[in-house]
């Protein structure tokens, strides 16, 4: 963490939010998905902490937002390693709607987004590794998040996984927003929670405030060192 004081929000013309782990308190819910997946495919009940540790180990090796390697590793650990990815993803698709309906916004984030929209003369964007259909779901009244804030209405522009060739940690998702608004990177502030996301935002030349998440503790020191500033929750943000 390089800055001792939080950057002034008035210094920026474009403010960009990540989604999972930054707006959505989703990371533990997605590990519950893995728990149900393992139970459904392999008849094994695994503790969530064990799943998180295993996922971190696999994701740390691949350093990619793709889940292919992780699901193949799950099949090697709990099965015979021969199950087709298509079958695994079919089970994920079956379980996912039940899990995502439980995802809540992170405490204080809805108030932050609404306050930025009302108080500051800047554009607000989202740069996410989620698919467009997921953002549409979380903008709807079918989700706990959508009942508090319609993301599609509050955000001026949303760039999703569908819009980029290279996911985070590649900076493309941020560069698209910067290019669209023709804003110098030094006038862009990003809120991120993950090492992949912070890396992408820093590579794009932006200022980064890290939102620490309990499920990214493995990378916490690196996140703090790479980000310009770090907070443990949205209620710490100074307006």
List the predicted regions and their residue ranges:
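Conserved SAM-binding loop
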Residues: 23, 105, 124, 166, ...
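N-terminal helical cap/lid subdomain that shapes the substrate entry/recognition surface
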Residues: 2-111, 120
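Conserved ATPase "switch" residues in P-loop NTPase domains
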Residues: 117
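A structural preference for short, pocket-lining loop segments at secondary-structure junctions
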Residues: 122-124, 128
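Conserved phosphate-coupling serine/threonine residues in phosphotransfer and NTP-handling enzymes
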Residues: 22, 128-130
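Glycine-centered short loops/turns at secondary-structure junctions
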Residues: 120-121, 205
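Asp-based, Mg2+/Mn2+-dependent phosphohydrolase catalytic module
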Residues: 1-12, 114, 131-239
